[in-house]
Amino acid sequence: TNLTSFFRESHHFDIFSAHLRSRPAGAPWSVWCSAASTGEEPYSIVMTALEALGNNPAFKLTASDIDSRVLATAAQGVYRLESITGLTQERMQRFFLRGKGSNAGMVRVKPELGRLIDFISVNLIRDDWPFREPFDVVFCRNVMIYFDGPTQRRVLERIHRVLKPGGMLFVGHAENFSESRDLFTLRGKTVYERR
């Protein structure tokens, strides 16, 4: 799926921001965006982190997708101007550069956003996830709807393994994992906490 936009399902970013602010200043954060697509979601995550934690946060985002083409687009961070028209003026100025001349009508995310992100290819269904350290937060939004029940369960078990106890999992608006209460506790609309 490549349907994506900046700050889609905005309540997630409000909850994420409050979660980031809940720890002492300077505490390190490790976050995984497991369906990076063309980059709007990972950049929204990093913008939220910069707003919540200040300009040089101890923050690292791993952004993955199965599709290397969309990852290349994400890593470039270049978008049509109309794709950010829903953002506040403050966010547009703080996080984007406007194209000039032949690049008029385009915007590019500022380099400090990209510096906080590692883009890598990961197939959620395969068991060879490359992660060494567990994450504080995982975004796995609007992917599971494409998997059957047993596959969803396997992926959730793996996410449980790579998420710290008490870590947060954000899922898509159409996704419900109430049958996985042994792994996750519902903490808000489509927000779960790892048991």
What is the predicted function of each stretch?
Residues 1-32, 172:
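Conserved AdoMet
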Residues 17-20, 43-50, 160:
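A structural alpha-helix within SAM-dependent methyltransferase catalytic domains
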Residues 27-44, 59-62:
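Conserved class I S-adenosyl-L-methionine
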Residues 34, 57-139, 143-153, 176-178:
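Extended basic-aromatic, gly/pro-enriched interface segments that bind polyanionic ligands
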Residues 51-57:
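Short helix-capping segments at alpha-helix termini
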Residues 137, 177-195:
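Core SAM-dependent methyltransferase catalytic element
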Residues 153-165:
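A short glycine-rich, Lys/Arg-flanked "PGG" loop and its adjoining helix->strand segment in the class I
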Residues 165-173:
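Conserved beta-strand signature within the Rossmann-like core of class I S-adenosyl-L-methionine
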